[in-house]
Amino acid sequence: GGGAMEQHANCVDIEWDKVQPGDLLFYPEDEHVGIAAGRDWLGRLLVVHCAAGTNGVVISHRTGFETAARPVWYGEE
């Protein structure tokens, strides 16, 4: 529970050039969250997320995502 805002609260923001698979990507005001999946053959970031109107999970580019963040795991400071 808690949604994207709570997930973002448990992350540290990172620069876009530091994004690795598994990092979280957020829309403005944490309205939506996606997971970095890697990069396409042109080096563009790929994002896995649920998209309205698509009936499920999609892989897309980072359009609309404003902030990149890395989850802070238990035991890390």
Residue ranges and their predicted role:
Residues 1-62:
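...with weaker cross-activation on analogous glycine-rich loops/strands in unrelated enzymes
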